[in-house]
């Protein structure tokens, strides 16, 4: 019996009482047998996540949101109407499946997006698995505004390159922002591009969105684009060693970028002018890398763009400025 014990009032317990105690006690210890509704499951899940050493940096900022997202999407329910379903009863199979997912989230530190094979960026759903970085980029916010005011006429944009496309999420958003453009997504990882192909198919863009395996511009020689966007690797060597366990489920190739986090950005900017049209520009995300960017490219005219994460996450550089800067560097 549990340490707390069962107590009978008055006389000592009969053999029937003892038998019932042994039948019931395991049920009290097993959450499977005590969670009846989505509300019950949600309360238990939040406690499990909140009391575990977890990191929430892959779309859900807290245990509350992580639990609601996991439960809703595992049950194929719309999370914007979560409250409507809180008192709905769960089937045994539903309960077992979600408790198993919570167990993997807590003990394996697997990000919820990988557990569900699903991630959301702005209001768009994307397929995701461990072959590609979980979609998260402030560039998505800028694409929602069609990169205004920098792209003055979205319908006039003819070509866009998403460098380091990964799952293809930004390339797909770019295709929506610039309907007349030929959008190309490139990545060094063929495995990541297989994920991008799934998303391209899901968004019915197989005829319009081009995917190219390339180490940055290597397989794009001779091609120029009106706009280049990139969310490249920018995590420093020291930061890589300190990353929470959740991030270690992601491809290191999509994160690691040398001592100052600028190894890939240096290569991108050094060649970008050769792949931009005359009035073209590049938009690059660098996390908290403002100081690293300014140290790596002193004197380069760049504009830091305002996003929800601050004014030090994403920058823009014009082709003419890049060409002049790197010409003088040599």
Predicted feature locations:
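Alpha-helix termini
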Residues: 52-57, 146-154, 204, 276
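Acidic, Ala/Val/Gly-enriched low-complexity intrinsically disordered segments
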Residues: 11-13, 17
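N-terminal auxiliary segments of SAM/dcSAM-dependent transferases
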Residues: 20-122
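S-adenosylmethionine
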Residues: 144, 180-182, 186-330
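SAM-dependent Rossmann-like transferase core, predominantly class I methyltransferases
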Residues: 85-92, 96-179, 189-195
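A general structural signal for well-ordered alpha-helical segments in protein cores
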Residues: 42, 67-68, 98, 167, ...
């Amino acid at each position: 019996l549990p340490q707390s014990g069962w107590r009978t009032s008055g006389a000592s317990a009969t053999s029937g009482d003892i038998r019932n105690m042994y039948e019931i006690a395991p049920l009290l210890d097993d959450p499977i047998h005590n969670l009846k509704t989505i509300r019950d499951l949600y309360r238990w899940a939040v406690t499990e996540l909140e009391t575990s050493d977890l990191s929430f940096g892959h779309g859900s900022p807290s245990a509350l949101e992580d639990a609601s997202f996991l439960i809703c999407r595992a049950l194929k329910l719309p999370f914007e109407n979560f409250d409507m379903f809180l008192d709905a009863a769960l089937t045994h199979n539903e309960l077992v499946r979600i408790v198993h997912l919570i167990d993997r989230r807590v003990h394996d530190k697997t990000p919820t997006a990988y557990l569900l094979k699903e991630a959301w960026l702005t209001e768009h759903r994307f397929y995701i698995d461990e072959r590609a970085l979980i979609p998260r980029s402030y560039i998505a916010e800028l694409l929602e505004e069609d990169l205004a005011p920098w792209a003055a006429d979205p319908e006039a944009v003819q070509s866009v390159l998403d460098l380091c496309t990964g799952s293809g999420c930004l390339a797909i958003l770019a295709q929506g922002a610039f309907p007349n453009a030929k959008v190309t997504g490139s990545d060094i990882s063929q495995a990541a591009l297989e994920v991008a192909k799934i998303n391209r198919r899901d968004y019915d863009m197989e005829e319009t969105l081009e995917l190219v395996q390339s180490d940055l511009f290597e397989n794009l020689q001779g091609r120029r684009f009106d706009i280049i966007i990139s969310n490249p690797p920018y995590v420093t060597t020291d930061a890589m060693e300190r990353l929470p366990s959740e991030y270690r489920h992601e491809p290191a190739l999509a994160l690691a970028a040398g001592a100052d986090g600028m190894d890939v950005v240096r290569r991108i900017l050094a060649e970008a002018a050769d792949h931009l049209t005359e009035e073209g520009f590049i938009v690059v995300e660098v996390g908290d890398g403002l100081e690293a960017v300014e140290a790596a490219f002193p004197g380069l005219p760049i504009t830091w763009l305002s996003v929800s994460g601050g004014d030090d996450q994403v920058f823009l550089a014009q082709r003419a400025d890049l060409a002049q800067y790197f010409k003088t560097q040599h």
